[in-house]
């Protein structure tokens, strides 16, 4: 993927989505304010109530305007029939170039203790992650937005860091934030079901250029006021209830191998609700096998041969145990 090629600007595509989100703030139960430095803050679930619809729209913003997110019945888990479905005709750019929460943002000058991972089109403007060199992509924009899975807006030091890295003024930045415990927060996290498959494909060394289309779905997890339980539910929705289909321009051997490598069943930590796993490692994410962060089931279709390969399995019992 090269910036010189005719790839779309994810900021040009997602910008109107951000403005519509702000315009519809009253009906979506969002709170919009301006920080002291001029940045626009959109509270989608911290002090504001937020909504599932807000989470759905935020997920489309995270995808850089290159994906659709729908919520509908007939999901993969019978007892939790409403599912979040994500589709993108450019899944690599949408998921890895925009949606992936890869920008570590911390208050390094104050004592707020703020930390969040930045997601969305603003990542591609700053392009501070090594991933953008691999993708060969960097976006340019006069305004941009970042989505944060956080219980509050970023402090001035973090806003300044983002502005400097992006080459923009604080007033050109929009920060959309919602904690995992909220309706919007939990919805936008479950909407990462396709993204985790793309991240896993990247991790196992599959040729990203060969992934030409993708769709994924996972059950809409009920929010919980406890952070650990809320985080566990959103992870379990994907790890044990997520199903992804990738369409690849690859031969059968590579497609089959990818289907076998993608699912969460490849992880040594597979088999227990995420909250239990998290407690087992005393809350240290780095002690959890990274292979766990994957969809439960993977379907890979080779567009060269028409053959389809499958890996993994849904675990309705574990989803029930997590959501109950």
UniProtKB/Swiss-Prot annotation:
GO terms in the biological process aspect are:
formaldehyde catabolic process; one-carbon metabolic process
Q: Which GO terms describe its cellular component?
A: cytoplasm
User: Which residues fall in a coiled-coil region?
Assistant: none
The UniProt keyword set, sorted, is: Cytoplasm, Hydrolase, One-carbon metabolism
Q: Can you state which reaction this protein catalyses?
A: 5,10-methenyl-5,6,7,8-tetrahydromethanopterin + H2O = N(5)-formyl-5,6,7,8-tetrahydromethanopterin + H(+)
Principal place where this protein is found? cytoplasm
Say yes or no: keyword Nucleotide-binding present.
no
Annotated protein name in UniProt: Methenyltetrahydromethanopterin cyclohydrolase
GN (gene name): mch
